[in-house]
A protein has these predicted regions:
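His/Asp/Glu-enriched short active-site or ligand-binding loop at hydrolase and phosphoryl-transfer sites
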Residues: 144-146, 150-185, 217-228
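CE4/NodB-like, metal-dependent polysaccharide N-deacetylase domain
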Residues: 60-73, 94-95, 112-144, 151, ...
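Catalytic grooves of carbohydrate-active enzymes
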Residues: 186-224
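A short acidic, amphipathic alpha-helical/loop segment
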Residues: 58-59, 84-88, 148-152, 204-208
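Active-site beta->alpha N-cap acidic-glycine motif
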Residues: 21-110, 121, 125, 134-135, ...
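N-terminal membrane-anchoring alpha-helices
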Residues: 1-34
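Non-membrane alpha-helical structural segments and their capping/turn regions in soluble enzymes
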Residues: 112-117, 176, 199-202
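A cross-domain feature marking catalytic cores of carbohydrate-active enzymes
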Residues: 47, 74-76, 98-100, 140-142, ...
Length: 230
């Protein structure tokens, strides 16, 4: 009996640790903003892993059409490769957030020192691209957090941004299914995660925006709503 209890207890601990690391909204290891603290019909759009030289301009056109501001979490290397496009993002009222320099799949396994270097290198590329007004918003690759990341972010001044609606647009290939998945989950204060490198991304964004606006929702830029300054 003791052995069985021990097994179940051990399994529970493992399950909790996995939940704490892989669900960015848990806040166990790193304090995050994964939902806006409001009951009003307010939403925030975020985009990861861009900018993409073909897809991101289409998304920007849609956002401009509906006067929606968003946050783009871009790896530093992508910023360096697409400096003019990154400047367009900023010039049209959006914000560039830190998403590490290389967005490595191994990032969660780095030492805290190496994590900090990745984060700092990304910020330096943001500044080098002439984007000094970028706020200190950070989103870890894949949304994975752990004690090492907490140490790397200590005294960094970053606000860590998560999400409570994950579009799964990198997995689901049918835009209709993605739109349905997102719109069914929209609630006051939702932070929505998209990626700006899928060929149907602009179509999805427009449908979601139209759905939300028809129901009285307003889109806000995270740093402005939260009162976060550089």
């Amino acid at each position: 009996m003791i052995t069985v209890i021990g097994i179940f207890s051990g399994a529970s601990v493992v399950a909790f640790l996995v939940y704490a690391s892989f669900y960015i909204g848990s806040g166990v290891y790193v304090k995050t903003v994964s939902r806006l603290p409001t009951d009003k019909k307010i939403l925030a759009l975020t985009f990861d892993d861009g900018p993409h030289h073909e897809i991101t301009p289409l998304i920007l056109d849609v956002l401009k059409k509906y006067h929606v501001e968003a946050v783009f979490f871009c790896p530093g290397e992508n910023i360096e490769k697409n400096t003019l496009l990154t400047r367009r993002i900023m010039n049209e009222g959006h914000l560039i957030g830190n998403h590490t320099n290389r967005h490595s799949a191994l990032f969660p396994f780095y030492s805290s020192k190496r994590m900090k270097t990745e984060i700092d290198d990304s910020w330096n590329r943001i500044v080098s691209a002439g984007l000094p007004d970028s706020s200190r918003l950070f989103r870890p690759p894949f949304g994975i957090t752990n004690p090492t990341l907490r140490k790397a972010l200590r005294n960094s001044g970053y606000t860590v941004i998560g999400w409570n609606i994950r579009s799964l647009d990198t997995i689901i290939k049918d835009p209709v299914v993605v739109v349905r998945r997102v719109t069914r989950r929209i609630r006051p204060g939702s932070i929505i995660l998209f990626h700006d490198f899928n060929y149907y991304a602009a179509e999805i964004i427009e449908r979601v925006i139209i759905y939300a606006l028809k129901r009285g929702y307003v889109f806000v830029r995270l740093d402005k709503y939260l009162g976060i300054r550089n």
